[in-house]
Amino acid sequence: MKIGVFSVLFYDKNFEDMLDYVAESGLDMIEVGTGGNPGDKFCKLDELLENEDKRQAFMKSITDRGLQISGFSCHNNPISPDPIEAKEADETLRKTIRLANLLDVPVVNTFSGIAGSDDTAKKPNWPVTPWPTAYSVIYDYQWNEKLIPYWQDLAEFAKEQDVKIAIELHAGFLVHTPYTMLKLREATNEYIGANLDPSHLWWQGIDPIAAIRILGQANAIHHFHAKDTYINQENVNMYGLTDMQPYGNVATRAWTFRTVGYGHSPYVWADIISQLIINGYDYVLSIEHEDPIMSVEEGFQKACQTLKSVNIYDKPADMWWA
């Protein structure tokens, strides 16, 4: 398994300095934002799509440092009820897929998207309860009239380009659980899979180990984000897991994103890595940092330290003992 990092952490650096820092930290891969929520500081889509020399220079800067691109990322909302947002998200995603094809980057990370309640809606609506029944009506509308038609078309485009799409299982979007991931995959094709981030599973009450087994057995894990979550049970008792307090209210929030090893022990992370490999995923652990009580530098380095201590780098030996 390789260890990488989402380069959005280092937008305070220029491209070359960022690459130097990642390489000096002993990592193997970088995940590069191309637009949407991650931004595009290090990767200007139109420039690279239009100019082969710039593409070659871009890749040379990366490979000269012994690094590879694990994936491009353009997390956004391609089925937004805001037509401008939806159009921009779709265009960015398709351009990113085209660039990935040109540069032999195997996967593009994004969100599934979330629609409004109906065709007249101006804002997204995320139904998470079947009753009152209006929510079930909204849910069916979003899946059958918005999500599936969009992704059926996009999945065929991804297949034509031979680029996998890794949808992050994230709250606020229709695909946020193993079930919804497999539901969309069944309605599209095998190019649609998961960008599995355990931090978004823990707070939903989903065991990441079980999710890895479910999705891995379906060959549906395309990318992995390494980020932790701390659950404060006393605060859960007050606010519930659907806590709407700002992320900065760490003392009172029910749960908080943490750097790897500060929500769950290294033993848990060792089990996660083992189960990923056992269930068919042996690609990259891409570090994210959204820890509210650590600097980016400290959080990143501690995540590196924890993951390096429990990672499985080599292929297994022949079972000479069996």
Feature map (PLM): residue ranges:
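Acidic/histidine-rich catalytic cores of soluble enzymes
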Residues: 2, 30, 72, 137-262, ...
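Conserved, mostly hydrophobic/aromatic
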Residues: 5, 22, 30, 62, ...
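Active-site beta-loop-alpha junctions enriched in small/polar residues
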Residues: 6-10, 33-37, 74-77, 113-115, ...
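Short, acidic/polar
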Residues: 12-22, 87-97, 204-214, 269-272
